[in-house]
């Protein structure tokens, strides 16, 4: 039984138009993740094509959620813009926000974590984390989808590399969900 992320998760990629966002969007789609939109302020109205399917880009998370029914976001924006991106997702009342970006100032992280707690709705994983995966259902972040298959185990790890290693070592058993949260992450 997957937790927090499953085949019904509808995912927004914040920063999808940037090189990292685009690269990892392609990889997440190839893993079966339902990417429903991208968000990049000032680039709303565009669309990017992945595996021959266009993915619309919006200026705000609220616009993307209204148009697509999204409930999850993954953040691939520069550290200087991460706080604003995460606050946008919290204000739109998404269920889960996965912050991949590293180098986010501690004060910015504290501010968006406090806002998420105040909202009572949005769960934050990250920043500076590899993300979350429910194998053969959805993969949000940068965890390789090929290192393990589905199963009954759950994993929460403070280390990205050890997340991958544990998933690989226990691949014959498989995972319901694995979360790489890194040291200062807030779940």
Identify the role of each PLM range.
Residues 13, 37-40, 57, 99, ...:
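General beta-strand structural signal in soluble alpha/beta enzymes
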Residues 66-72, 76, 80-103:
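Rossmann-fold NAD(P) dinucleotide-binding segment
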């Amino acid at each position: 039984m997957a937790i927090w992320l499953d085949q019904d998760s509808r995912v927004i990629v914040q920063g999808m138009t940037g090189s990292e966002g685009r690269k990892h969007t392609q990889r997440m789609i190839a893993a079966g993740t339902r990417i429903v939109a991208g968000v990049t302020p000032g680039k709303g109205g565009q669309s990017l094509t992945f595996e021959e399917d266009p993915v619309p880009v919006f200026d705000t998370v609220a616009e993307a959620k209204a148009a697509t029914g999204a409930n999850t976001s993954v953040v691939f924006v520069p550290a200087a813009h991460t706080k604003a991106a995460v606050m946008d997702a919290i204000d739109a009342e998404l269920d889960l926000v996965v912050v991949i970006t590293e180098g986010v100032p501690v004060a910015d992280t504290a501010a968006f974590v406090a806002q998420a707690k105040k909202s009572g709705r949005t769960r934050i994983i990250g920043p500076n984390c590899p993300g979350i995966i429910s194998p053969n259902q959805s993969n949000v972040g940068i965890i390789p989808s090929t290192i393990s298959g589905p199963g009954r185990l759950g994993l929460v790890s403070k280390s990205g590399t050890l997340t991958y290693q544990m998933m690989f070592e226990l691949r014959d058993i498989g995972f319901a969900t694995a979360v790489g949260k890194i040291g200062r992450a807030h779940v």
